[in-house]
Amino acid sequence: MDRFMWTNGLLEMNETLVIQQRGVRLYDGEDKAKLDVGGVVLSTHRLLWRDQKNHECCICIPLSQVIFFEEQAAGIGKSAKIVIHLHPAPENKEPGPYQHSKYSYIKLSFKEHGQIEFYRRLTEEMTQKRWENTPVSQPIPTGTGPKAGRTRAVGIVGIERKLEEKRKETDKNISEAFEDLSKLMEKAKEMVELSRSIANKIKDKQGDITEDETIRFKSYLLSMGIANPVTRETHGSGTQYHIQLAKQLGDMLQAPLEERGGMMALTEVYCLVNRARGMELLSPEDLVNACKIFESLKLPLRLRVFDSGVMVVQLQSHSEEEMIASALDNVSDKGSLTAEEFAKLLGLSVLLAKERLLLAEKMGHLCRDDSVEGLRFYPNLF
């Protein structure tokens, strides 16, 4: 409450009334203020409160003093409140009803409702900050309250100087931001050229490039991303977009699929693709639609949906018979396997390992033991 100062309650030039509400009690933090119930007025520049009985008792606080605010729901026998957190009182603050306060926030208690609309309008004003764009052109005089103070002198020249300094600082920040952006674009071009050079070396096998180096180069390329991702801006939003996207996915995913045993969960594909696309993020719906037309475009990839609903992307050469045979061979060699153990053997995710084991079980090659220790698969000897 020590942030409030006395005022005559009149709006200044360039100051506009936003909303007012009667039946509002002030709280100094958690304590009721010594002032009675009154009306609260929100303008483009200030928050004012006038005593309901003694109209000469009027106080105000600039909106620039507000840090943030929040709603407090009504309870049994309690009115709804708006809690307003404030900056410390400035040294040159005009006199007000409180000289000192142990709280850094106030509460507006709405006895006659209206807090929802008031909160909405307060949110709008704090977002727009119109007091910065249209400063009052006259000093805000103090009123004739119980402790009326002197008239506060606000210089027009001082306000204009501050606005000019703020404008120059904003221009400087924008210029620095564009300089950083230009440098980033230059580096991006260098990275794209480097990625193309590495791709050509891998393709042509020029020079002394070992298999380990080839794998490392591929991982670097993947981390650097796609140089020219397919977007709706470049290919529209219809079928043509999904066709071009499917072709790009076919080129991008073939190498990662081969390294992961020929199959990847669609969620893993989604993360991999969006990480490579950088800022041009792909929606889950577009990814699914592109994957659905792999077969019609005769691409080397296929979208597969297991009985459990799990969706995966797999190589066309990755046949169901090979998956079943691999599961049966590994389970037979170990005697029995859980999905976690099978995943470690093949370097797959636990989800895909479980789907392979369930597929082999469905075809009659494996059987399960579902106990408190978990699901374990055995060779089907029957």
UniProtKB/Swiss-Prot annotation:
Record domain GLUE N-terminal: where: 1-88
Domain GLUE C-terminal: from-to ranges: 105-138
Disulfide bridge positions per record: none
Coiled-coil stretches noted in the UniProt entry, renumbered to this chain: 160-193
Any one GO molecular-function label of the UniProt entry: ubiquitin binding
Main function: Component of the ESCRT-II complex (endosomal sorting complex required for transport II), which is required for multivesicular body (MVB) formation and sorting of endosomal cargo proteins into MVBs. The MVB pathway mediates delivery of transmembrane proteins into the lumen of the lysosome for degradation. The ESCRT-II complex is probably involved in the recruitment of the ESCRT-III complex.
Family: Belongs to the VPS36 family.
Protein name per its UniProtKB record: Vacuolar protein-sorting-associated protein 36
Source organism per UniProt: Danio rerio (Zebrafish)
Annotated gene: vps36
